[in-house]
From Swiss-Prot:
Keywords: Nucleus, Ribonucleoprotein, Ribosome biogenesis, rRNA processing. Residues 139-151, 183-203 have a biased composition (Acidic residues). Component of the ribosomal small subunit (SSU) processome composed of at least 40 protein subunits and snoRNA U3. Interacts with snoRNA U3. The keyword Methyltransferase does not apply. Involved in nucleolar processing of pre-18S ribosomal RNA. It comes from Chaetomium thermophilum (strain DSM 1495 / CBS 144.50 / IMI 039719) (Thermochaetoides thermophila). This is U3 small nucleolar RNA-associated protein 11.
């Protein structure tokens, strides 16, 4: 009963609170909490020390099968600070069978073939429109598009020139003039070389010829882009057909043997 009597009289224990500016850090740490944290820290430091010693004294010819799950030796060195310690092993992804992959390539081939047929129809319509617009005498290759100029590198870089000014006002006036010239140049390029000053001097026939030439140039650019798209789709279709043929169960043409000879399959005589 004496212990119960003392327990009733004992004051309730309260944790010491942090000062107002340190309330975000939680309650104050006691000595027992510090001992646990220090013991855990020293234990981890001892483990790291032993691991460093093992790494320094390791055998270069050592091998165990856990190494097979790594990309290469020293992942921490190749990946740098982003290395988390995990190795690239089995992620649970199941490898698809050859038959399944071949079926998927068949679906891809069907999609590419459909898009190639659509692109071929579009190209045919554009070529017919180009001929009807009067481009039978002018081949499409005569018109140089912007893409051709970029690929050929015909646009040379402008030489840089350093200009010195006496004052800030003179420099500001020169910058405003340069900006106005660039805006005027962009406006002229948008008009595609169409000069409004010569419009009054031109006759109706010349105006019609000029409009016809602009339409032909526009159609020629579209025809070139359609041909480029059709060629890319045809190349993709050929590559998919070749991959599908190489994945067949029997030997097909397009592959090579281990000795380097090309596989040639002859059809059975009928």
């Amino acid at each position: 009963m004496s212990s119960l009597r003392h327990a009733i009289q004992r004051r309730a224990h309260k944790e010491r609170a942090q000062p107002l500016e340190r309330q975000r850090l939680g309650i104050l740490e006691k000595k027992k909490d510090y001992r646990l944290r220090a013991r855990d820290y020293k234990k981890k430091q001892a483990v790291l020390k032993s691991l460093r010693q093992k790494a320094a004294e390791r055998n270069e010819d050592e091998f165990y099968f856990g190494m097979m799950s790594r990309k290469g030796p020293g992942s921490a060195l190749t990946r740098g600070k982003g290395f988390t310690g995990t190795v690239d092993g089995d992620r649970g992804n199941k490898a698809l069978s050859v038959e399944t992959v071949r079926l998927l390539k068949t679906q891809d081939l069907g999609y590419v073939r459909t898009m190639r047929n659509i692109a071929a129809k579009e190209l045919k319509e554009l070529e017919e429109r180009y001929v009807l617009a009067g481009g039978a005498d002018q081949p499409v290759e005569e018109f140089n598009s912007d893409e051709d100029e970029e690929e050929s590198g015909s646009k040379q870089a402008k030489p840089k020139k350093i200009v010195f000014f006496e004052g800030v006002e003179e420099r500001q006036q020169a910058l405003e003039k340069q900006k106005a010239d660039e805006e005027m140049k962009d406006y002229d390029e948008e008009e595609d070389g169409y000069d409004f000053d010569d419009e009054e001097e031109m006759t109706e026939k010349e105006k019609e010829e000029r409009r016809k030439q602009l339409v032909l140039e526009k159609l020629a650019r579209k025809v070139k882009a359609a041909r480029k798209k059709l060629k890319a789709l045809a190349d993709a279709e050929y590559e998919l057909e070749l991959q599908q043929a190489k994945m067949a169960k029997t030997a097909t043409s397009g592959g090579f043997t281990k000795s380097g000879r090309r596989i040639k399959v002859r059809e059975r005589k009928r």
